[in-house]
């Protein structure tokens, strides 16, 4: 078996494994009393992560440069990053929600890379002169890892909005689900709610929200905040590294290239998210909306700009 066949087998296994892991994660949420489902899904995800790592490593060995020079390699690295970040965060939080929201995205990315891209775009090609630099590994890998983390954090914010169904629930308690909160209904003024000894929340508009659901919302909100807080510094480092590399390659730190512009927009959105959470104590719906916008902007920055085929970052992608 040559390297190309081995790579194809690993990618096919990764897609099948992600599909299986997604179904197992969803089953663990639907049937929480069945023990072992979450561990089984995590094991499958770990095997997928290893398969993707083998694919990228073999391309690195065969071609002699870090495998982030075209769209196919970039997509596989993003899928690897999503599974790696997911496994790391899940090991720290023991949350079943992480895999349920991240694995479908990783599966879609892997499917797009292996099924949608033509064969000629999946093959490695010689590097253009500007990419023959050690900055390739540092800048691009850090940016891709930051995208993986920010995508995962934003997905949790989207999940928060789905669960609340448009209700403006401003959390006031701690991240473990204690304290009070405010519910703003569509046809009445905001009303104050508090928890009674039985654990059932009462409020003036007679809207009852189960305390377990509130614990879930507070956990999702806090986890999203922490994950985005982890990804933002990496995004900053990646942008700075790219500016230094651009100065070495083209003699300018910033050229307002489409990719650079959208990277800046991405940075500003998540900077605003963290600013509002830290200085204005935003919780709940408002920061979730901001993070959801950030989710879309990350994809525009990563994929959308490359479909234009313009700018300094268009080589090796969809030019």
Swiss-Prot record:
The keyword Plastid applies. The lineage of its organism: Eukaryota, Rhodophyta, Bangiophyceae, Bangiales, Bangiaceae. Its main location: plastid. This is Cytochrome c biogenesis protein CcsA. The keyword Chloroplast applies. It holds the Pfam family Cytochrom_C_asm. It is a multi-pass membrane protein. One of its GO terms (cellular component) is plasma membrane. One of its GO terms (biological process) is cytochrome complex assembly. It is found in: Plastid, Chloroplast thylakoid membrane. Required during biogenesis of c-type cytochromes (cytochrome c6 and cytochrome f) at the step of heme attachment. The chain crosses the membrane at residues 11-31, 34-54, 71-91, 97-117, 142-162, 227-247, 254-274, 288-308. InterPro entries: Cyt_c_assembly (IPR002541), Cyt_c_biogenesis_CcsA (IPR017562), Cyt_c_biogenesis_CcsA/CcmC (IPR045062). May interact with Ccs1. The gene is ccsA. Belongs to the CcmF/CycK/Ccl1/NrfE/CcsA family. GO terms for molecular function: heme binding. PANTHER family: CYTOCHROME B_B6 PROTEIN-RELATED, HEME EXPORTER PROTEIN C. Keywords: Chloroplast, Cytochrome c-type biogenesis, Membrane, Plastid, Thylakoid, Transmembrane, Transmembrane helix.
């Amino acid at each position: 078996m040559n390297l190309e066949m081995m790579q194809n087998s690993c990618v096919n296994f990764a897609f099948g494994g992600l599909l299986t892991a997604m179904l197992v994660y969803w089953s663990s949420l639907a049937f929480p009393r069945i023990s072992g489902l979450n561990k089984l899904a995590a094991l499958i995800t770990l095997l997928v992560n290893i398969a993707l790592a083998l694919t990228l490593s073999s391309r690195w060995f065969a071609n002699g440069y870090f495998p982030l020079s075209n769209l196919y390699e970039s997509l596989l690295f993003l899928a690897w990053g999503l599974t790696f970040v997911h496994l790391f965060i899940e090991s720290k939080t023991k949350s079943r929600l992480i895999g349920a929201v991240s694995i479908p995205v990783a599966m879609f990315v892997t499917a797009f890379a292996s099924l949608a891209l033509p064969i000629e775009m999946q093959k490695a090609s010689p590097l253009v002169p500007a990419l023959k630099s050690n900055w390739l590994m540092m800048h691009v890998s850090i940016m891709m890892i930051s995208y993986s983390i920010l995508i995962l954090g934003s997905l949790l914010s989207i999940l928060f909005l789905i669960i609340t169904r448009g209700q403006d629930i401003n959390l006031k308690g701690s991240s473990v689900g204690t304290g009070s909160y405010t519910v703003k209904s569509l046809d009445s003024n905001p009303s104050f709610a508090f928890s009674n000894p039985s654990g059932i929340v009462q409020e003036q508009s007679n809207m009852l929200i189960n305390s377990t659901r509130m614990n879930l919302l507070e956990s999702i909100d806090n986890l999203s905040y922490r994950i985005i807080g982890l990804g933002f510094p990496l995004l900053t480092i990646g942008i700075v590294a790219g500016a230094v590399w651009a100065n070495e390659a083209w003699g300018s730190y910033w050229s307002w290239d489409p990719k650079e512009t959208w990277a800046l927009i991405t940075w500003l959105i998540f900077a605003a998210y963290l600013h509002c959470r830290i200085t204005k104590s935003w919780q709940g719906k408002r920061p979730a909306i901001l993070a959801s916008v950030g989710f879309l902007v990350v994809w525009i920055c990563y994929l959308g700009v490359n479909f234009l085929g313009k700018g300094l970052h268009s080589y090796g992608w969809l030019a």
